[in-house]
Amino acid sequence: EILDRLLRGQRFVDLHAVVREGLRVGVERYGLKELEPLVGFRRDLDLRDTGAARLAVELALEISDTAAIDDELRARVEAYNRGDCLSAAALRDWLEARRAELPQQIPRPMDTDSEPSEPVAERDRRIEELSNALLAGVPANPAERSDAEQARWLLAGMLGYFRREEKSAWWEHFRLSDLESEELLAEREAVAGLEFVGELPRTGRQQVPTHRYRFPAQETALDPGDKVRARAIDDPENKTFGDVVAIDLVAGTIDVRKTKRAKDLHPAALFHEQVVKATALEAALLAFGEHVHADGLDVDGSFRAASDLLCRRPPRRRAGTTSVLRRPGEDLVEAALRLCRELDGGVLPIQGPPGSGKTYTGARLVLALANEGKRIGVTAVSHKVIENLLEEVGRAAGESNVAIRRVHKTDGGATPAGIESVVSNEEALGAVGPRTVVGGTAWLWARDDAQATLDYLFVDEAGQMALAQALAAARAARNLVLLGDPQQLEQPRRGAHPEGTNVAALVHVLGAEAATLRDDQGLFLDRTWRLHPALCTFTSEVYYDGRLEPVPGLERQALTGPTPFAGSG
């Protein structure tokens, strides 16, 4: 919060930009260390020694070996960082001295109000008050907490999750928005020097134009699917410009599907828009928090599945079912379908390693339940993942000769054949019904008008989706089915969050130390149709407790030709 106030008040000055634009110095780089002889600063320790210590600490943190960071290493890294701080202060003082020598005074920037707007202040106040209420009576020591108290502690820490993520994204947004086009050439999250080429042919039901731009050679991390904005000087409205459809670094072209309001704008530069307002998600999470504060974690209703996910409870099933999830010799897809039918306001986690058929299994479950008249929703961290599952549902429907309607709430882009694209939340929620599958991100399912609209919500790639997102979307459905693999990369996060609140949904279910789901937690897809036995053995032992096995016939997979990777690779 202190950092946010300083940034809002524009209290930070980029000394590197000041030096680069205001001085001419006989050095190759205008970095802090290269300027130290100029300003007369001398470090206490040799940079070569402290640099080696810093690398050693970074390695220890990367491999989670914090015990390797002894007092000597810590002291050397602290000395390295202290030297950087003192060097920056010395540079600032040197620049101020040069300023005082000038024949005329240079005006300083006007003070800017550092207080948040009234809506933001009210938002922060509500989060803080509810967090304090949830934490009342919860021991500070984790070892002293009951399971319910730990769940309340996690929920309290997650109430501000989206606010913290949003802050970090806004800081970067305003920094990039204020840069000159030439400066954006050096930013990997941008592309500059744009020259409009023309409009590309529209496809399918595409309602907005896609424009191609040419740009000079530069490094950029922009990828298809990224939303982009123009600089403030090129787009005074400061709103979303469009999203990247394709980018060709060799040809130097970028194709951007524009928003309607930006169809006639042709800016000199674009940068990655990483601010995604999570108003609906935050509101849903706050509603869940208020429910827990008022009624606890064991009340039936639209928050039951969310409570079970937060508390890491085994699948809640109808009375009369046995505690055994998968029966001896039972086919995995049949077991999963039976368990879905038995769910009674609970959560069914399904962990699938590489090539184990997560999407295949999920699609057959979706098809069977939708064909039985259940109201089915699908969500994931991206539209691409949602479309992939919806396409597999279509293939499964074709194999079974079953008619299933598939609807995807998108941002207006083209969708694969057979999938209806709708652009409004009202259209998407209005499509929910028997023999219809509706896909949308967590933003759709977290809305107030989506509450209790579904019998089942399938969360694909739940090993990537943040727990906070999954909890926010959970109130849309009576039951949750989590598909994914906690061993794969999680969704990137920007903010600093309390321990345990910044994990993916399936990682949370699994727990900190476990590699695979226990038999009483959910289903583990233990066969791979992709990995050669030699690769499978290694992968299974290192990542999956030795539980993953290849199906027969994969031993015939081989690389041939003059390569050192001949055979299994």
Q: Which residues does each PLM region occupy?
A:
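Mixed-charge, glycine-rich, non-catalytic linkers/tails in nucleic-acid processing enzymes
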Residues: 54, 58-138
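ASCE P-loop NTPase motor cores of helicases and related translocases
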Residues: 259-441, 547-569
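Conserved helicase motor core of SF1/SF2 NTP-dependent helicases
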Residues: 371-373, 380-392, 433, 437, ...
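Active-site-proximal helix-loop-helix substrate-binding element of RNase H-like nuclease domains
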Residues: 2-6, 10-82
